Amino acid sequence: MIYQISVPGLVADVEEIRVLEWHGCIGHEFDAGDLIVELETHKALVEVRAGQRGILRQILVEEGNWQKIGFPLCLMTDTAGEPLPDSVESAGDLLVAFEIT
């Protein structure tokens, strides 16, 4: 199955988030609880952790770039050989955990 991780809207009055650091490259396998990406708002740091096992297949927002809340950050799949969709909209949502500091 194909999953997307989107920019979380967890901090009040924040419309966009900046990607600080990806904690894996394309093809990296994450287990539940692994840190996938660190994000930054003007008010807080946000850690995005995997809620289930998955393989990072496509990064849609590079480090240092800002993106609006709700926009997809990356695509992940259950297996490395799974074909990616033609459009991000056809991907499901990946269960993730967010930690705000």
Residue ranges, per PLM feature:
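Acidic, glycine-anchored pre-beta loop/turn
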Residues: W22-F30, V61-Q67, A80
